[in-house]
From Swiss-Prot:
Keyword Transcription regulation appears in the UniProt entry: no
Functional description taken from the UniProt entry: Microtubule inner protein (MIP) part of the dynein-decorated doublet microtubules (DMTs) in cilia axoneme, which is required for motile cilia beating.
UniProt KW keywords: Cell projection, Cilium, Cytoplasm, Cytoskeleton, Flagellum
Keyword Cytoplasm on entry: yes
Compartment annotation: Cytoplasm, Cytoskeleton, Cilium axoneme; Cytoplasm, Cytoskeleton, Flagellum axoneme
SUBUNIT field: Microtubule inner protein component of sperm flagellar doublet microtubules.
Top-level taxon of origin: Eukaryota
GO cellular component: axonemal A tubule inner sheath; axonemal microtubule; sperm flagellum
Gene: Cfap161
Protein name in UniProt: Cilia- and flagella-associated protein 161
Protein backbone atom coordinates (compact mmCIF):
# COMPACT_ATOMS: atom_id res chain seq x y z
CA UNK A 1 0.00 0.00 0.00
CA UNK A 2 1.38 3.37 -1.01
CA UNK A 3 2.36 5.66 1.83
CA UNK A 4 3.47 9.30 2.03
CA UNK A 5 7.14 9.12 2.87
CA UNK A 6 7.47 12.91 3.27
CA UNK A 7 6.77 14.71 6.51
CA UNK A 8 4.65 17.88 6.84
CA UNK A 9 7.75 20.06 6.90
CA UNK A 10 8.95 18.96 3.47
CA UNK A 11 8.20 21.38 0.60
CA UNK A 12 7.32 19.90 -2.75
CA UNK A 13 7.12 21.27 -6.28
CA UNK A 14 8.37 24.71 -7.35
CA UNK A 15 7.96 26.12 -3.87
CA UNK A 16 10.84 28.55 -4.20
CA UNK A 17 9.41 30.05 -7.38
CA UNK A 18 5.98 30.33 -5.77
CA UNK A 19 7.43 32.28 -2.84
CA UNK A 20 9.25 34.70 -5.13
CA UNK A 21 6.13 35.11 -7.27
CA UNK A 22 4.00 35.94 -4.24
CA UNK A 23 6.57 38.47 -3.02
CA UNK A 24 6.68 40.06 -6.48
CA UNK A 25 2.89 40.33 -6.58
CA UNK A 26 2.82 41.99 -3.18
CA UNK A 27 5.58 44.44 -4.13
CA UNK A 28 3.77 45.31 -7.37
CA UNK A 29 0.52 45.80 -5.45
CA UNK A 30 2.13 48.13 -2.91
CA UNK A 31 3.77 50.20 -5.66
CA UNK A 32 0.46 50.65 -7.50
CA UNK A 33 -1.28 51.55 -4.25
CA UNK A 34 1.29 54.23 -3.45
CA UNK A 35 0.92 55.71 -6.95
CA UNK A 36 -2.88 55.54 -6.79
CA UNK A 37 -3.10 53.23 -9.79
CA UNK A 38 -5.29 50.56 -8.27
CA UNK A 39 -8.63 49.98 -9.98
CA UNK A 40 -10.59 50.84 -6.84
CA UNK A 41 -8.59 54.07 -6.42
CA UNK A 42 -9.21 55.15 -10.02
CA UNK A 43 -12.88 54.31 -9.63
CA UNK A 44 -13.19 56.47 -6.52
CA UNK A 45 -11.38 59.41 -8.14
CA UNK A 46 -13.57 59.31 -11.24
CA UNK A 47 -16.80 59.13 -9.27
CA UNK A 48 -15.67 61.82 -6.84
CA UNK A 49 -14.88 64.16 -9.73
CA UNK A 50 -17.93 63.45 -11.86
CA UNK A 51 -20.42 63.36 -8.99
CA UNK A 52 -19.08 66.42 -7.19
CA UNK A 53 -21.86 68.89 -6.28
CA UNK A 54 -22.07 72.00 -8.45
CA UNK A 55 -23.63 75.43 -8.02
CA UNK A 56 -25.80 76.73 -10.84
CA UNK A 57 -25.97 80.34 -11.96
CA UNK A 58 -28.83 82.45 -10.64
CA UNK A 59 -30.72 84.44 -13.28
CA UNK A 60 -31.67 87.84 -11.89
CA UNK A 61 -33.61 88.97 -14.97
CA UNK A 62 -35.12 85.58 -15.85
CA UNK A 63 -33.04 85.11 -19.02
CA UNK A 64 -30.16 82.85 -20.01
CA UNK A 65 -26.71 84.44 -20.40
CA UNK A 66 -23.39 83.40 -21.85
CA UNK A 67 -21.26 81.96 -19.08
CA UNK A 68 -24.23 80.68 -17.07
CA UNK A 69 -24.00 77.23 -15.54
CA UNK A 70 -27.25 75.37 -16.12
CA UNK A 71 -28.65 71.86 -16.28
CA UNK A 72 -30.52 70.80 -19.41
CA UNK A 73 -33.76 69.09 -18.38
CA UNK A 74 -36.37 67.24 -20.39
CA UNK A 75 -39.59 67.78 -18.40
CA UNK A 76 -41.79 64.91 -17.32
CA UNK A 77 -44.16 63.67 -20.00
CA UNK A 78 -47.02 61.24 -20.24
CA UNK A 79 -46.73 57.87 -21.90
CA UNK A 80 -46.59 58.35 -25.65
CA UNK A 81 -46.77 55.97 -28.55
CA UNK A 82 -43.64 54.12 -27.44
CA UNK A 83 -44.17 50.50 -26.56
CA UNK A 84 -42.59 48.79 -23.60
CA UNK A 85 -41.05 50.34 -20.52
CA UNK A 86 -41.25 54.13 -20.31
CA UNK A 87 -39.27 56.28 -17.88
CA UNK A 88 -41.22 59.05 -16.17
CA UNK A 89 -39.97 62.12 -14.33
CA UNK A 90 -37.65 65.00 -15.19
CA UNK A 91 -34.51 63.85 -17.02
CA UNK A 92 -31.27 65.82 -17.14
CA UNK A 93 -28.63 65.63 -19.85
CA UNK A 94 -25.45 64.01 -18.49
CA UNK A 95 -22.09 62.88 -19.75
CA UNK A 96 -21.70 59.12 -19.74
CA UNK A 97 -18.07 57.90 -19.86
CA UNK A 98 -17.18 54.40 -20.94
CA UNK A 99 -17.09 52.05 -17.96
CA UNK A 100 -13.82 50.32 -18.83
CA UNK A 101 -11.88 53.29 -20.23
CA UNK A 102 -12.85 55.51 -17.29
CA UNK A 103 -11.01 53.16 -14.91
CA UNK A 104 -7.88 52.81 -17.04
CA UNK A 105 -7.03 56.51 -17.25
CA UNK A 106 -7.61 59.68 -15.25
CA UNK A 107 -8.75 61.46 -18.42
CA UNK A 108 -12.10 60.67 -20.00
CA UNK A 109 -12.13 59.12 -23.44
CA UNK A 110 -12.81 61.31 -26.47
CA UNK A 111 -15.48 61.31 -27.75
CA UNK A 112 -17.45 60.84 -24.53
CA UNK A 113 -21.04 59.63 -24.61
CA UNK A 114 -24.08 61.44 -23.24
CA UNK A 115 -27.32 60.15 -21.78
CA UNK A 116 -30.34 61.28 -19.79
CA UNK A 117 -30.72 60.41 -16.13
CA UNK A 118 -33.58 60.83 -13.69
CA UNK A 119 -32.05 63.50 -11.46
CA UNK A 120 -32.08 67.28 -11.31
CA UNK A 121 -29.41 67.67 -8.63
CA UNK A 122 -26.57 69.79 -10.06
CA UNK A 123 -23.35 67.79 -10.20
CA UNK A 124 -20.22 67.57 -12.29
CA UNK A 125 -21.67 65.30 -14.94
CA UNK A 126 -24.82 67.31 -15.75
CA UNK A 127 -23.81 70.96 -15.25
CA UNK A 128 -23.20 72.66 -18.60
CA UNK A 129 -21.77 76.11 -19.27
CA UNK A 130 -23.26 78.21 -22.08
CA UNK A 131 -20.37 79.45 -24.21
CA UNK A 132 -19.93 81.55 -27.33
CA UNK A 133 -19.17 79.72 -30.56
CA UNK A 134 -16.29 82.09 -31.34
CA UNK A 135 -17.85 83.52 -34.50
CA UNK A 136 -20.23 85.99 -32.85
CA UNK A 137 -17.74 86.82 -30.04
CA UNK A 138 -20.42 87.30 -27.40
CA UNK A 139 -19.19 88.53 -24.05
CA UNK A 140 -19.78 86.71 -20.80
CA UNK A 141 -23.01 87.88 -19.23
CA UNK A 142 -24.64 88.78 -22.54
CA UNK A 143 -28.18 87.48 -23.00
CA UNK A 144 -28.68 84.49 -25.32
CA UNK A 145 -31.34 85.13 -27.97
CA UNK A 146 -33.40 82.79 -30.14
CA UNK A 147 -31.64 81.81 -33.37
CA UNK A 148 -28.17 82.64 -32.03
CA UNK A 149 -25.37 80.10 -32.00
CA UNK A 150 -24.00 78.91 -28.68
CA UNK A 151 -21.96 76.00 -27.36
CA UNK A 152 -22.61 73.76 -24.39
CA UNK A 153 -19.43 72.93 -22.48
CA UNK A 154 -18.82 70.74 -19.47
CA UNK A 155 -15.68 70.40 -17.35
CA UNK A 156 -14.54 66.77 -17.35
CA UNK A 157 -11.63 64.77 -16.00
CA UNK A 158 -9.37 65.49 -13.07
CA UNK A 159 -7.79 68.40 -14.95
CA UNK A 160 -11.16 70.03 -15.63
CA UNK A 161 -10.71 69.96 -19.42
CA UNK A 162 -13.66 71.50 -21.26
CA UNK A 163 -15.70 69.16 -23.44
CA UNK A 164 -18.30 70.42 -25.91
CA UNK A 165 -21.63 68.89 -26.87
CA UNK A 166 -21.39 67.96 -30.54
CA UNK A 167 -23.14 65.98 -33.26
CA UNK A 168 -22.78 65.12 -36.93
CA UNK A 169 -24.64 63.32 -39.69
CA UNK A 170 -25.02 59.61 -39.06
CA UNK A 171 -23.12 57.08 -41.13
CA UNK A 172 -22.93 53.31 -41.31
CA UNK A 173 -20.12 53.37 -38.77
CA UNK A 174 -21.29 56.27 -36.63
CA UNK A 175 -24.79 56.32 -35.16
CA UNK A 176 -26.56 56.00 -31.83
CA UNK A 177 -26.33 52.64 -30.10
CA UNK A 178 -30.01 51.75 -29.69
CA UNK A 179 -32.03 53.66 -32.29
CA UNK A 180 -29.35 54.04 -34.98
CA UNK A 181 -30.12 57.76 -35.33
CA UNK A 182 -27.74 60.73 -35.26
CA UNK A 183 -25.65 60.42 -32.14
CA UNK A 184 -24.73 63.17 -29.68
CA UNK A 185 -21.35 63.08 -27.93
CA UNK A 186 -18.83 65.26 -26.12
CA UNK A 187 -15.55 66.30 -27.73
CA UNK A 188 -12.58 68.51 -26.88
CA UNK A 189 -12.27 69.88 -30.42
CA UNK A 190 -13.59 73.39 -31.12
CA UNK A 191 -15.43 73.09 -34.44
CA UNK A 192 -18.62 74.28 -36.11
CA UNK A 193 -20.22 70.97 -35.13
CA UNK A 194 -20.45 72.22 -31.54
CA UNK A 195 -22.94 75.00 -32.36
CA UNK A 196 -26.55 74.81 -31.15
CA UNK A 197 -29.52 77.16 -31.34
CA UNK A 198 -32.58 77.71 -29.16
CA UNK A 199 -35.96 77.77 -30.92
CA UNK A 200 -39.24 79.04 -29.49
CA UNK A 201 -41.61 76.24 -28.49
CA UNK A 202 -44.55 77.35 -30.65
CA UNK A 203 -43.55 77.05 -34.33
CA UNK A 204 -46.19 79.59 -35.38
CA UNK A 205 -44.51 82.25 -33.24
CA UNK A 206 -40.94 81.07 -33.82
CA UNK A 207 -40.14 83.61 -36.53
CA UNK A 208 -41.53 86.49 -34.47
CA UNK A 209 -39.49 85.49 -31.42
CA UNK A 210 -36.19 85.19 -33.32
CA UNK A 211 -33.76 87.67 -31.83
CA UNK A 212 -35.62 87.88 -28.50
CA UNK A 213 -33.92 86.75 -25.27
CA UNK A 214 -34.24 83.12 -24.22
CA UNK A 215 -36.03 82.77 -20.90
CA UNK A 216 -34.62 80.41 -18.32
CA UNK A 217 -36.60 77.51 -16.84
CA UNK A 218 -39.07 77.47 -19.75
CA UNK A 219 -39.55 74.88 -22.47
CA UNK A 220 -37.57 75.40 -25.67
CA UNK A 221 -36.32 73.30 -28.57
CA UNK A 222 -32.55 72.96 -28.99
CA UNK A 223 -31.47 72.52 -32.62
CA UNK A 224 -28.07 71.45 -33.90
CA UNK A 225 -26.84 74.23 -36.16
CA UNK A 226 -25.02 72.09 -38.72
CA UNK A 227 -27.56 69.28 -39.22
CA UNK A 228 -30.75 71.12 -38.20
CA UNK A 229 -31.74 68.19 -35.95
CA UNK A 230 -33.36 68.76 -32.58
CA UNK A 231 -31.94 67.33 -29.37
CA UNK A 232 -34.14 64.43 -28.27
CA UNK A 233 -34.34 61.81 -25.51
CA UNK A 234 -35.72 58.29 -25.88
CA UNK A 235 -37.45 57.42 -22.63
CA UNK A 236 -38.09 53.86 -23.80
CA UNK A 237 -34.52 53.03 -24.88
CA UNK A 238 -32.15 52.25 -22.02
CA UNK A 239 -28.35 52.21 -22.01
CA UNK A 240 -26.08 50.41 -19.55
CA UNK A 241 -23.58 53.05 -18.50
CA UNK A 242 -20.87 53.53 -15.90
CA UNK A 243 -23.54 54.72 -13.45
CA UNK A 244 -26.28 52.21 -14.27
CA UNK A 245 -29.27 52.18 -16.59
CA UNK A 246 -29.92 55.51 -18.34
CA UNK A 247 -31.82 56.81 -21.37
CA UNK A 248 -30.50 57.38 -24.88
CA UNK A 249 -30.01 60.93 -26.22
CA UNK A 250 -29.89 61.61 -29.96
CA UNK A 251 -30.26 64.46 -32.45
CA UNK A 252 -33.53 63.86 -34.28
CA UNK A 253 -36.65 65.96 -34.80
CA UNK A 254 -39.97 64.36 -33.88
CA UNK A 255 -43.05 66.19 -35.20
CA UNK A 256 -46.71 65.49 -34.48
CA UNK A 257 -49.63 65.89 -36.89
CA UNK A 258 -49.57 69.68 -36.33
CA UNK A 259 -45.85 69.96 -37.24
CA UNK A 260 -44.98 70.70 -33.62
CA UNK A 261 -42.01 69.14 -31.87
CA UNK A 262 -43.00 66.31 -29.55
CA UNK A 263 -42.22 66.39 -25.80
CA UNK A 264 -39.08 64.30 -26.35
CA UNK A 265 -37.63 67.36 -28.17
CA UNK A 266 -38.56 69.84 -25.44
CA UNK A 267 -35.89 71.00 -22.99
CA UNK A 268 -35.41 73.55 -20.24
CA UNK A 269 -32.26 75.49 -19.33
CA UNK A 270 -32.63 75.30 -15.56
CA UNK A 271 -30.81 77.84 -13.38
CA UNK A 272 -30.08 77.96 -9.67
CA UNK A 273 -32.47 78.75 -6.87
CA UNK A 274 -31.72 82.18 -5.35
CA UNK A 275 -33.10 81.04 -1.99
CA UNK A 276 -30.93 77.95 -1.77
CA UNK A 277 -27.81 77.81 -3.91
CA UNK A 278 -27.67 74.01 -3.73
CA UNK A 279 -31.10 73.65 -5.37
CA UNK A 280 -32.56 74.56 -8.75
CA UNK A 281 -35.58 76.56 -9.83
CA UNK A 282 -37.44 73.28 -10.30
CA UNK A 283 -37.25 72.71 -6.54
CA UNK A 284 -39.34 75.80 -5.81
CA UNK A 285 -42.82 74.65 -4.89
CA UNK A 286 -45.60 76.04 -7.02
CA UNK A 287 -48.53 77.82 -5.34
CA UNK A 288 -51.23 75.39 -4.34
CA UNK A 289 -54.57 76.08 -5.98
CA UNK A 290 -57.37 75.58 -3.50
CA UNK A 291 -59.99 73.09 -4.64
CA UNK A 292 -63.38 74.73 -3.97
CA UNK A 293 -65.55 72.14 -5.68
CA UNK A 294 -66.53 70.40 -2.42
CA UNK A 295 -67.43 73.73 -0.81
CA UNK A 296 -69.50 74.77 -3.83
CA UNK A 297 -71.40 71.48 -3.82
CA UNK A 298 -72.16 71.84 -0.10
CA UNK A 299 -73.52 75.35 -0.67
CA UNK A 300 -75.61 74.21 -3.64
CA UNK A 301 -73.69 76.23 -6.20
CA UNK A 302 -73.68 74.59 -9.61
CA UNK A 303 -70.51 75.20 -11.62
Amino acid sequence: MAQNVYGPGVRMGNWNEDVYLEEERMRHFLEKREKGELLIQRNRRVKKNILRPMQLSVSEDGYVHYGDKVIIVNPDQVLGEEAGKFMRGDLSLCMSPDEVKAQLSDDLEIPCGVSAVQTIAPMGRNTFTILSDGANSCEMGQVVVYGQNFCLGIAAGLEGKMLYLTSDHRTLLKSSLKSGLQEVTLTDEVTHLNCWQAAFLDPQLRLEYEGFPVRANEKIVIYHRHTNRALAVHRNLFLRTYFGKEMEVVAHTYLDSHKVEKPKNQWMLVTGNPRNKSNTMLDISKPITEDTRALEQAMGINT
